[in-house]
Each structure stands twice: as C-alpha cells, then as structure tokens.
Swiss-Prot record:
It comes from the Bacteria. GO terms for molecular function: 1-deoxy-D-xylulose-5-phosphate synthase activity; magnesium ion binding; thiamine pyrophosphate binding. Mg(2+) binds at D147, N177. Pathway: Metabolic intermediate biosynthesis; 1-deoxy-D-xylulose 5-phosphate biosynthesis; 1-deoxy-D-xylulose 5-phosphate from D-glyceraldehyde 3-phosphate and pyruvate: step 1/1. It is an enzyme of class 2 (transferase). The gene is dxs. Its cofactor is Mg(2+); thiamine diphosphate. This is 1-deoxy-D-xylulose-5-phosphate synthase. Catalyzes the acyloin condensation reaction between C atoms 2 and 3 of pyruvate and glyceraldehyde 3-phosphate to yield 1-deoxy-D-xylulose-5-phosphate (DXP). It comes from Ralstonia nicotianae (strain ATCC BAA-1114 / GMI1000) (Ralstonia solanacearum). Its EC number is 2.2.1.7. It catalyses: D-glyceraldehyde 3-phosphate + pyruvate + H(+) = 1-deoxy-D-xylulose 5-phosphate + CO2.
Length: 636
C-alpha cells in the first residue's frame, strides 16, 4: 500500500491542516502502516489497530503537544508515535537504540508522560491539568485509559480526587474495547454491561429503535449501540457520581462522530466546570480480520507475514520457564486440594490457561489489581488454603506495602511465582524484573529463591509450596537451558547451595563465582575458561552463609553474579555474611548497573551489562590478577 497522505504528516500541526473529509483516508493508511510495521519488528498490534481513529481525532482536535495527552499503559501508542514524527523510526521499534514500545518523555515532546504499567494516566493528567491551572496556562490534559485499566484502584483514586475540582481542564477518554490483555473481569465491567438494562432504557428502547430505523446511515452504529450502549440513556451513571460530565458511549471508529464530539469537549474543558469524561467503544484489531477474531493472540506478536497471519510455532526444543510453572501448578493442584491460583489479569502471560480450564473453582483472576491480589491471597491463606500468586516481578512492586503488612508481617504461607525476573528484552526498563531480590530479601519471614534452570524451577516451586511462610521463586522470561524437567514434586533442602564446578587452579589464582538463578549458566561458561569454582546459590534468603564462608576461606577471590540490581541484591547478602564473620577475601559484585537498562535483544542487553560469559570473564580479569587457563588442543 502507498502512504500518500500519511507521508505528508510529520507532526500533528500538519494533520490539523487536513480537511475533515481526508481523515478517513488517513486512518486507512495509518492502520495499514501499523500492521506493516509491527509485522516486520514485532510488538503490540491489536490494541494499536483499535485506536487509529481515536488517535487521529485527538491530535486533530487538541493542540498537542501544548494540550497534553497521556496514554495509559502505552500499548496503544504506535499511531500516536507515527503521527508525531517517528514514522521512519518505527523500523527500530523496541530494538537496541531504537524507539520504545511505550511513551517516553525523553523520546518526544508529544510523549508527555512515560507509561507502561497500567492505570496511571488519570493521576498524571490531573496533575498536569492542575499544574496548568495554577500557572495560568490555558491548555487541556487528556487521559486515554482502557476498560481493563479502569479496574485498578489507582484509576478510581484519581477520579475520586479529580471530581472535587471545578473549572479544571481535564478530559478522561475511556477506550472501551472489552479487553485488557486477558478479557477484563470484575464488577466494573459487569456494571458497564448492565447499564443498558435499566428501567429507563427499557422504557425508551422502542422509541430509539424507531428513530434509528428511519436513519439508514446509522444502522450499523445502531447495532453497536445495541451491544455497547452502556449508559447512554441511564441518568446518573457512576462516572457522573464521581463528579465528571459523562458523554457517550460513541463509536470510536467513526471520525464523523469523534471529531465534533471532541471539539465540544475541548471547548467545555477550557470554559470550566466539571472535568469531562468521554466513553468511546472500539474494537481491538479493527481492520485486520485475524486480529479482530483473536485479539489475545495478536496482542504482542513477534514478526509475522500479515497475509498469512501468525502460524502455529513448531514445538520448541526448550520449554519456557512460564510453561514449567504452568505445568507445575496443575500437577501440584492435582496433588493438593488446598492450592488456589491467583493472577492480576495475566492468565496467558503467566501460564495459567490450563490451570483455569482444569480447576476453574480454584482460579482467581482479580483484574489489574496487584495490591488487592496480594492481600486477597493473604485472606485465602488465613482460611487454610495455599495461594499461589502468579505475577510479573515488575508488577509485584505495585503491591509492596501489602506484601509487607498483609502477608509477611502475619507470616502467611503465600507463594509468589515471579515471572519475567531480570531483563526482559524488547519491553525495556518498565517491565524489567531488576529489583525483586533487593526488595524481597529485606522483608522478615520472606524466603526468596532463584532457580538455575527449568528443572530446578519446578523443584523450588515445590520447595516454596511446602513452607509455612511467604515465599518467592523468581525466574526469567523465555526458554530454559534445555535440561530435562523431572515430574517430581519433591522439595529441595531449604537454604542449601550446590557446587556445580570445583576449581583446580593453583594458590593465588583460585576464584569462586557465587551465581544466582539465570546467571549460573554464563558463570559456568566463564569458569571453564578461568578454571574457577561455580556455586549455584539457589537461595537468596535464607542465604547459605556457611557455603559462602567456606568458599571465601578456600579461594583467593570471590565473585557474585546476579541478573538483578547490584545495590542491595543477592551479592550484597553475600558481603553481609562475610562482613559479619570478619572474612576479608576480596569480592567482586556483578549485576545490573545503577541505571535503567533500555529495550533490546535480551542477549545483547546481557552483554551490554557485562553479564554474559565474556563479560563475566573480562570483569574478573580486570579486577583480579588471574589469567584464563590455556585451551587444551583437540585430539584428532
């Protein structure tokens, strides 16, 4: 497809010079460009296809970047990036040194607030609106939030706060596509679906049908109205009760409706009064039939042929850690009826699809509500159940107070299965699990484990489940090392490390590498070239202090390596043990640097951080006076 109109748009000011009748053509080109770009790079697709018209309308009506648009989560920001001067850079999307898959303030003045975790947009936009008002600046702040993100408490906290203000230039746009990543759950979504069934709606429905029947151009929207009219005719909706002026729902793909509605809303926002709330109905995957039919599959695909669609992948040689967790969860649930599984809206990503199918009465999807998920698990544990919370490492940060106060303080036996621990590749710093070892090991009663491979992941999950205290097992994204996963559910000894390789180096050259989790494999590769001892530490807490002390006393140099932040992490735990015992063996700590590591290929990022085998070896040689052993010649 040629992009004759799109190629003329490098900034929203150029978009605003178009005749409104040209916007439909632009939408077609923009949607095709999004599809073509994501097919070549991978990335988020169905959410972006669903926001093409909304994005065009927002930039057409509002004076961006002076008017501030905040995209909640940011999965849907690709059309925005394309219209704001980054069309050519889409070829670098989510790649090392390329543009981010999420809004970033450092990337463009049109990215007014960095997002990636959900439900933050209304809070940020409220701050911007009040900031503008305080400084006497005449501009509008717009939060664009999906119906899935609206289920989180933070969104309601912001709305509750915003509703008390008057003469506030704030607009909230609810992008209602009936999806988050997994289908949305909870009372809010049922409420939105139930509004159209009230008595007022029933009494007027026939009259509305007669009106629509004589207006053929809107018959298609009439069908959408029948499906999605969640409050159009119901007075005093929940959003009005929060103090907003509610408009909608309107068709989020109908530019003829979107543009004048947004123009009216902008005018009202600038004139003062209550904050404005626009409810638009969109369809994830709009315009690409395969994504419309399966928006979850096309939520975040890798590279694919858009003519053929995503093909079923060949069975990989190595299972992923997520798959190992999912299988363990089902096996343990079959063995112990006390097990219940909890996810904050990440059923597919956390590997819980089979568990939900086999044990629907023991599966709880609480929506995008990490704080609630943690305390909810604590409540289940109080009644003698054994909750397993499947959550990404980065998202557990959102439930930290609940983890301390509601679970650990009461020493409740909740298992936290932390997926995406360490660097996560293309999703970048916002999704990296860089801090869990540091923020978990300082909590009393908490046990923290880091498996070296997929078989050990299963073993440590069983170990965690067997405890009468809160536990966490952290494991990385993607495929394991290729070891055979044994079907056993037997736990490992608590707090015991494993020596994987013993050094034969002479005195003065003896190095021990204390490796945690995913770093055992590259540490072992480096150790072969250095003739170093390698210890698979397994437990961040309780640390095998006896092993650490023995290794420090029998080696000349100690190296700790972890795929997590150095400050306060697992290496710090080793240093604390050595300091407490008065052991002064030189120590080198390796881990993630004191900066946010950007997006890119996972292997490239590890190399950039010096956490591949070459980097580990180079750091050891630079710090200590040791030499790699001579490579033995091959025997023919």
């Amino acid at each position: 497809m040629t992009y004759e109109l799109l190629n003329t748009i490098d900034a929203p000011a150029e978009l605003r010079r178009l005749d409104r009748r040209q916007l439909g053509t632009l939408a077609d080109e923009l949607r095709a460009f999004v599809l073509e770009s994501v097919a070549q790079t991978g990335g988020h697709l169905s959410s972006n296809l669903g926001t093409v018209e909304l994005t065009i309308a927002l930039h057409y009506v509002f004076n961006t970047p002076d008017d501030r648009i905040v995209w909640d989560v940011g999965h849907q920001s690709y059309p925005h990036k394309i219209l704001t001067g980054r069309r050519e850079q889409m070829a670098t999307l989510r790649q090392l040194d390329g543009i981010s898959g999420f809004p970033r303030r450092s990337e463009s003045p049109y990215d007014t607030f960095g997002t990636a975790h959900s439900s933050t947009s209304i809070s940020a936009a409220l701050g911007m609106a009040l900031g503008a008002k305080t400084q006497g600046e005449n501009r509008v702040a717009i939060a664009v939030i999906g119906d899935g993100a609206m289920s989180a408490g933070m969104a309601f906290e912001a709305m509750n706060n915003a509703g008390v203000y008057r003469n506030l230039p704030l607009v909230v746009v609810l992008n209602d596509n009936d999806m988050s990543i997994s289908p949305p759950v909870g009372a809010l979504n049922r409420y939105l679906a139930r509004l159209m069934s009230g008595q007022f709606y029933a009494a007027t429905k026939k009259g509305v049908e007669k009106l629509l029947s004589v207006a053929p151009p809107v018959l298609e929207f009439a069908k959408r109205f029948e499906e999605h009219a969640k409050g159009m005719l119901v007075p005093a909706t929940m959003f009005e009760e929060f103090g907003f002026n509610y408009i909608g729902p309107i068709d989020g793909h109908d530019l003829e409706s979107l543009v004048p509605t947004l123009q009216n809303i902008r005018q009202r926002a600038l004139e003062g009064g209550r904050p404005q709330f626009l409810h638009v109905v969109t369809k994830k995957g709009q315009g690409y039939k395969l994504a419309e039919a399966d928006p979850i599959l096309y939520h975040g695909p890798g590279k694919f042929n858009p003519q053929e669609g995503i093909k079923p992948a060949a069975r990989p040689a190595k299972v992923s850690y997520t798959q190992v967790f999912g299988q363990w969860l089902c096996d343990m649930a079959a063995a112990d009826k006390r097990l219940v599984g909890i996810t904050p809206a990440m059923r597919e990503g956390s590997g819980m699809v089979e568990f939900e199918q086999r044990f629907p009465d023991r599966y709880y999807d609480v929506g995008i509500a990490e704080q609630h998920a943690v305390t909810f698990a604590g409540g289940l544990a109080c009644e003698g159940l054994k909750p397993v919370v499947a959550i990404y490492s980065t998202f557990l940060q959102r439930g930290y107070d609940q983890l301390i106060h509601d679970v650990a303080l009461q020493n409740l036996p909740v298992v936290f299965a932390l997926d995406r621990a360490g660097l996560v590749g293309a999703d970048g710093a916002t999704h990296a699990g860089a801090y869990d070892m540091a923020y978990l090991r300082c909590i009393p009663n908490m046990m923290v484990m880091a498996p070296a491979d997929e078989n050990e992941c299963r073993q440590l999950l069983s170990t965690a489940f067997a405890q009468d205290c809160p536990t966490a097992v952290r494991y990385p994204r993607g495929a394991g090392t290729g070891v055979v996963v044994q079907p056993t559910l037997e736990p490992l000894p608590v707090g015991k490390a494993e020596v994987r390789r013993a050094s034969t180096a002479p005195a003065g050259q003896r190095v021990v590498i204390l490796a945690f989790g995913s770093m055992v494999a590259p540490a072992a590769a480096a150790a072969e070239r250095l003739d170093a001892t390698v210890v698979n530490m397994r437990f961040v807490k309780p640390l095998d202090a006896a092993c650490v002390l023995e290794m420090a006393r029998t080696h000349d140099y100690v190296v700790t390596v972890e795929e997590g932040c150095v400050m306060g992490g697992a290496g710090s735990a080793c240093l604390e043990a050595l300091a407490a015992a008065g052991v002064a063996t030189p120590v080198l700590q390796l881990g993630l640097p004191d900066r946010f590591v950007d997006h890119g290929d996972h292997a490239a990022l590890l190399a950039l951080c010096g956490l591949d085998a070459n980097g580990i070896l180079a750091s050891i040689r630079e710090r200590f006076a040791v030499q790699p052993r001579a490579v033995q010649p091959r025997v023919a």
